[in-house]
């Protein structure tokens, strides 16, 4: 009886390790471990009291040793069989996953059969304790010698059987670590916030993208609602249907996007030196539309450029417009031949074509918009202000005749003899190379959706004006308690690929919007960024909870997010959207 109680105690000790194997494997290991001991328990109890106690102790100790080894699948076996030794002697390197599976099938199958034989043998020994030698021979004809030896020497047989079973069980259940890892990975249940958890953790054994794509795909109804909300936010009726592979994103747009994202802006305004873009929040780039009229300008120093700006919404206000031309530095030999400073400088002039000419009847009318001086030995872009022309085009789209650009010498105003300022594509120039150097028109508009004040002023716009606690300077230092349930900012990543928008949104592929959540406990500390009204509300709630609710955890500071995308007309658009991401949270 004590031996069985000891067995139960050992099983409880190794309950954690048993989780690695299945229930069927546990039953087989348990029967194989206790079979030889259970067969000889009556023999130990039938002897004297002293011998019975010592026998019980020895049986319990041997049983504990056998079970401890049998139920520890991660321990190295004390002894190996001949097949194990021959297999380990053939190779010194760590077996691969396929080798481990093959070794498992070769070694474990016959030993599993051996366990079944031990199971049947133990049942018969327990049911027939007073067996004779002839009955044993008839029932165990294929094991006559081994069983005959055990029946004459029970103690020696018990010890040898225990050692043999312990070695066999150890060899069978020492699994390859990769097999255990694969089984654990397959049983992973990814939580809803797995993306935020993975982002906060370090490098993982598994692929972050694979886990997220396989386990966190929203259902179709959720995707439809997300798409509707984002379209309303972006002021669109439907997502654009375009071929991204045929569109080249201009380098100036990429640089402007990097400039906006790399600086802390106080509002949604897009800064542009030299232009009145203080209240602009949208930038669009346009390329020249080829037509038959281009054949009338065969020279490189004089060319007509036409830009279709119909994609600009009528409710947006134009704040600025500029024409950017690319300059290619000439060789040192050409620059050296022009020893005079006047010969190494050229003038670029841009005109608005206000009226087209009629051959033999009238000449076209031009309006000079801007002029710039450039040098031959510099490679850069030249920007020209063309806002009056674009304003006229938006008011009367049918009178958009384009721009006329000329390159002349500074002194004599004669045509420039070199291809310094790139106005048109050369005959032998590749199309891909020209796309990075072609003239571009940039328009800066305001859609009127952003507020007049800075979006960072949200923190001071509620509950108390000048008396707001967040305005108090200087603050006394406070010791923050790291409580997860108090008001704070949490991660919330928005991935545009979830709604299939990664084909027309160039950058970013997603952004962290964050959200505010948590309790506002009494009393409110300074780091909760609360107003005087929130302090009074929390005080009244503490005295009479049923009268007023607690203060709420809400965003106190918001920031804008710049997006670079393509519209239905394949126009590259850079837009700053206000109040897109949470900067700070507080109790209000």
Curated annotation (Swiss-Prot):
Q: Where is the composition biased (Basic residues)?
A: 140-153, 468-481
Q: Which domain of life is it from?
A: Eukaryota
Q: Which residues get removed as pro-piece?
A: 24-456
Q: Which tissues is this chain's protein expressed in? A: Expressed in the dorsal region of the embryo, and becomes enriched in a dorsal midline stripe just prior to gastrulation. Expressed in midgut mesoderm and in two overlapping regions of the embryonic large intestine. Expressed in a long-range concentration gradient in the wing imaginal disk.
Q: Where in the cell is it found?
A: Secreted
Task: Look up the signal peptide feature and give its range.
Answer: 1-23
Q: Which GO terms describe its molecular function?
A: BMP receptor binding; collagen binding; cytokine activity; growth factor activity; heparin binding; morphogen activity; protein heterodimerization activity; protein homodimerization activity
| Gene Ontology BP, a term | embryonic hindgut morphogenesis
Q: Where is this region: Disordered?
A: 74-169, 454-484
Attached carbohydrates are found at 120, 342, 377, 529
How does the annotation summarize its subunit structure?
Heterodimers of scw/dpp are the active subunit, dpp/dpp homodimers elicit a basal response and scw/scw homodimers alone are ineffective in specifying a dorsal pattern. Component of a complex composed of dpp, sog and tsg. Interacts with nord and gbb; the interaction interferes with dpp secretion.
| Job description of the protein | Required during oogenesis for eggshell patterning and dorsal/ventral patterning of the embryo. Acts as a morphogen during embryogenesis to pattern the dorsal/ventral axis, specifying dorsal ectoderm and amnioserosa cell fate within the dorsal half of the embryo; this activity is antagonized by binding to sog and tsg. Induces the formation of visceral mesoderm and the heart in early embryos. Required later in embryogenesis for dorsal closure and patterning of the hindgut.
Family per similarity comment:
Belongs to the TGF-beta family.
Protein name according to UniProt: Protein decapentaplegic
Tell me which species this is from.
Answer: Drosophila melanogaster
Question: In the UniProt record, what gene is named as encoding this protein?
Answer: dpp
